[in-house]
């Protein structure tokens, strides 16, 4: 396929790829977009989590969780409901560290205390808590009424014994390791799954076993052999319970920090697994004063991040494995994120880049930590007012289709561009992130290849303050109306004979509805 690149008055004609010509300051930048998709995501790729941390969860003197746990969150709040409905469907992952301390009420006559109490003498530093049947019904009613899908995290430690052993190597004491051994007691989980089916909760997309008990363990570890045996039990259990339903929910595990050796053994031993999940906090600590620089320089694209993605893809692509890869939890900075960073415009440089990069490497779903709770929520804790990343997530969901196109940029290191087949047209959607604080990105589009018109969604911070919790779309402030309705996200239509321009330190989604030269993006009639 032909393309033309204009550079200082020179027209160069080449073939096989579709090129775009861009200008960064005085530099000419060439953007290459391959015509054939290199990966495919789920249609509802964007996912968000609801955790279990209580109000007493604090990091660095900051206690940002409030009543955001799915045990105590106000599920009738209009803003929350409206925010979730805008995705319809939004994949919601229920779980987190304390899911392995959660038990499920089996009779309404049983006492059921839903509070996790701090106690450093106990596993994970918290007491057990209980999910009541009434609360489970409320959660499922919320999922149904908001048009969502649920992925629920089961307690994988029930029945196991925790052992603490010293680590000695070459005569030196290296600390302690905490391991959970023994068989998984699945009786409580079995009740919850059976109860859910009897109640007709068909919006449960999958059941996840455990949280961060494998891979690079942070608190308690389970061996890959034991974890595989437990996952097999869960598969047998769900298959038996759903045997008359035609389809069954997904079996998802392990939801851990990736470790190549551990994941390889676990997945090799678990051919029944549908989804292999890993968690990502590649910005480092939420207490890091240098977090702003990490975001602006995109230094989170380090070798550890790349090897994690590539390693998991190699495992799931091995013969005999049917599992696909999800990011089951990604908050950027661990320990609740950082106030003034994770909940502001600047965090979009991490979030949007990771959405794009993950999709390129055939990740099917990307679950943001959190919908609300901590400093990294898409919605602010307590007020539920959308943070800037909420609008970025919603635009991605609406504009970026499942087919992923590979891009290559020649001429600058400060710009990242991702491209997908468009969600609702036969064209493509590009996402352009300008990490340059001084110069705009200017890109020329050939109307003969991309059509005559485009739709721009340009996101910029209020008053050019990168740490603003407010964001503008095409120069207009985005805010809720008095009744908590999410604002319309309307594009500006531009003529493709004119360059598109992305301001310094900003992002832009560009929808090119076509007709384009991307035949792979053409949808069947009526779709």
Curated annotation (Swiss-Prot):
The active site is at residues 212, 329. One of its GO terms (cellular component) is plant-type cell wall. Its EC number is 3.2.1.167. Optimum pH is 7.0-8.0. InterPro entries: Glyco_hydro_79, Glycoside_hydrolase_SF. Gene3D superfamilies: Glycosidases (3.20.20.80). Keywords: Hydrolase, Signal. GO terms for molecular function: baicalin beta-D-glucuronidase activity; beta-glucuronidase activity. It catalyses: baicalin + H2O = baicalein + D-glucuronate + H(+). It holds the Pfam family Glyco_hydro_79n. Residues 1-25 form the signal peptide. Beta-glucuronidase involved in the initiation of H(2)O(2) metabolism via the production of baicalein. Unable to use glycyrrhizin, gypsogenin-3-O-D-glucuronide, luteolin-7-O-D-glucoside and apigenin-7-O-D-glucoside as substrates. Belongs to the glycosyl hydrolase 79 family. Homotetramer. This is Baicalin-beta-D-glucuronidase. The lineage of its organism: Eukaryota, Viridiplantae, Streptophyta, Embryophyta, Tracheophyta.
